[in-house]
């Protein structure tokens, strides 16, 4: 429960020996875009790439979507609810686990804006919506900088919401032919995210 109402988090655990899951090496918390849900192909592909690395992966449905609304409302209230959600997921998965958080589209924005508050080691931003379609002057690039940590952006070359520029701690990967949905070859997004996670210092058990 958050100040905005109930959220839902489905946690998948790293595969074990057939009897029980392995103790996770890190926690990956992911969420959806404005009107979507956590079952999008790109989010599932990232989950499937992260589990063999030893991640516990939480797919989060935010309170406004649990209520059936499509618009997230105030960013401040959305961010406050997200911080509460991450705290609860960490309690369930292991409060001392290194945290990586992320999402697609609007969820990527939330993950960037709250990374400092949650203590995230890194942020994964799928289909980061740099600006509203047709309005490049309304840039949201500053939200990427708010993360204050390593960020991986995975966007499609045909995304009408634009593509961010590389920055000191922001790596941008552009998938040729993909739109904002990243649904043409979601396994490519998953593999890209998995390789990045595997390369983050101290995150994956040797």
Model-predicted segments: where are they?
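Serine-hydrolase catalytic machinery in alpha/beta-hydrolase-like enzymes
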Residues: 1-98, 110
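Active-site nucleophile loop of the alpha/beta-hydrolase fold
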Residues: 62-63, 125-133, 156-158
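Gly/Ala-rich beta-loop-alpha elbow adjacent to hydrolase catalytic centers
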Residues: 103-111
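Hydrolases whose catalytic domains are alpha/beta-hydrolase-1, hotdog thioesterase
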Residues: 110-114, 134
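Short beta-strand/loop motif that positions the catalytic acidic residue
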Residues: 146-148, 153-155, 159
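Catalytic histidine-centered segment of alpha/beta-hydrolase-like enzymes
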Residues: 178-191
């Amino acid at each position: 429960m958050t100040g905005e109402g109930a959220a839902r988090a489905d946690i998948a655990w790293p595969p074990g020996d057939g009897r029980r899951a392995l103790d996770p090496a890190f926690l990956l918390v992911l969420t959806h875009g404005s009107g979507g849900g956590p079952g999008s192909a790109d989010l599932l592909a990232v989950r499937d790439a992260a589990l063999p690395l030893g991640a516990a992966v939480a797919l989060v449905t935010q309170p406004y979507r649990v209520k059936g609304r499509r618009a997230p409302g105030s960013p401040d209230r959305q961010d406050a609810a997200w911080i509460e959600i991450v705290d609860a997921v960490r309690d369930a998965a292991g409060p001392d686990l290194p945290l990586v958080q992320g999402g697609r589209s609007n969820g990527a924005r939330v993950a960037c804006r709250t990374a400092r508050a949650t203590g995230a080691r890194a942020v994964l931003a799928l289909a980061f919506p740099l600006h509203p379609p047709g309005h490049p002057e309304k840039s949201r690039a500053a939200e990427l900088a708010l993360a204050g940590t390593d960020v991986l952006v995975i966007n499609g070359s045909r995304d009408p919401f634009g593509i961010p520029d590389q920055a000191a701690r922001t790596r941008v990967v552009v998938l040729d032919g993909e739109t904002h949905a990243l649904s043409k070859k979601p396994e490519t997004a998953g593999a890209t995210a998995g390789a990045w996670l595997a390369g983050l210092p101290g995150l994956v058990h040797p």
